[in-house]
């Protein structure tokens, strides 16, 4: 389950924020 933010980053269930390439 990954939630994508409007700025193109993604917040994983663990709380880590990653940049969607």
Curated annotation (Swiss-Prot):
It is found in: Cell outer membrane. One of its GO terms (biological process) is monoatomic ion transport. Keywords: Cell outer membrane, Disulfide bond, Ion transport, Membrane, Porin, Transmembrane, Transmembrane beta strand, Transport. GO terms for molecular function: porin activity. Its main location: membrane. Coiled coil: none annotated. GO terms for cellular component: cell outer membrane; pore complex. It is a multi-pass membrane protein. Belongs to the Gram-negative porin family. Structural rigidity of the outer membrane of elementary bodies and porin forming, permitting diffusion of solutes through the intracellular reticulate body membrane. Disulfide bond interactions within and between MOMP molecules and other components form high molecular-weight oligomers. This is Major outer membrane protein.
């Amino acid at each position: 389950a990954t939630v994508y933010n409007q700025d193109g980053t993604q917040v994983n269930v663990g709380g880590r924020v990653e940049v969607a390439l």
